[in-house]
From Swiss-Prot:
It is an enzyme of class 5 (isomerase). NCBIfam families: PRK00702.1 (NF001924), rpiA (TIGR00021). It comes from Mesorhizobium japonicum (strain LMG 29417 / CECT 9101 / MAFF 303099) (Mesorhizobium loti (strain MAFF 303099)). This is Ribose-5-phosphate isomerase A. Catalyzes the reversible conversion of ribose-5-phosphate to ribulose 5-phosphate. Its EC number is 5.3.1.6.
């Protein structure tokens, strides 16, 4: 199977967790878009759901395909969020934000009872950091914030290029009006320490480390679907099922 077909298979497996009447957080990115297309088929045949999109891009696709939408203001508590990821580690800590919607994705995930991550096998890693970490920052004081991020990372033994995300020759601007810095720190051994340190920088709006939010990962590979469940309590093992 090619990469797109793997995304479709992961999305199809996630759709099995959706039931009539659910309030759904709907992610952003190419894998999440495959889920939207499959969800739209279910809606067309009578399934009733309400979707809360994590980006204007996702909202536009949902409207085009007829998936009913709400907002977090109208629907502040969600049953399930389905979203993709740029990297997934064995504890279901994620790097997200490659699609530029990490702030809204994190807010929606936190408002959900459960979060299912869908991805192909290439996104599974032992330690996060191969994919550059997206950091959403205020436009004001950009250079000062970039320097503060580099110094904070250095205090944790991390270093590497920090680049402003560009699109069409201009700085990429998020739906919230912010810039994104992509930090190529390499291997991140202590994600929680980095998360806390980045949150302490005034110019940082949010970062792409998702810690303790994903409850299940559905991973598609050439040998089938692997379902990984997050540990339910400290010290317990993450559970793996292969279908």
């Amino acid at each position: 199977m090619d990469a797109r077909q793997l995304k479709v298979e992961a999305a199809r497996a996630a759709l099995a967790h959706v039931s009539d009447g659910m309030r759904l957080g709907i992610g952003t990115g190419t894998t999440a878009e495959e889920f939207v297309r499959l969800l739209a088929d279910k809606v067309a045949t009578g399934m009733t759901v309400i979707g809360v999109p994590t980006s204007e891009r996702t909202a536009a696709l949902c409207r085009e395909l007829g998936v009913p939408l709400s907002t977090l203001e109208e629907t502040p508590e969600l049953d399930l969020t389905v979203d993709g990821a740029d990297e997934v580690d064995p504890e279901l800590t994620l790097i997200k934000g490659g699609g530029g919607a990490l702030l809204r994705e994190k807010i929606v995930a936190a408002a959900s009872q459960r979060m299912i991550v869908i991805a192909d096998r290439s996104k599974m890693v032992e330690t996060l950091g191969r994919f550059p970490l997206p950091i959403e920052v205020n436009q004001f004081g950009l250079r000062a914030t970039e320097i503060a991020i580099a110094k904070t990372a250095a205090d944790l033994g991390l270093s590497g290029p920090i680049t402003l995300r560009m699109t069409g020759g201009q700085a990429f601007v998020t739906d919230g009006g912010h810039f994104i810095l992509d930090a190529s720190f390499g291997r991140i051994p202590d994600t929680r320490a980095l998360s806390n340190a980045l949150h302490a920088i005034p110019g940082v709006v949010e970062h792409g480390l998702f810690i303790g939010l994903a409850s299940t990962a559905i991973i598609a590979g050439g040998d089938g679907i692997q379902t990984v469940h997050a540990a339910r309590k400290p010290g317990s093992s993450t559970n793996h099922d292969v279908a």
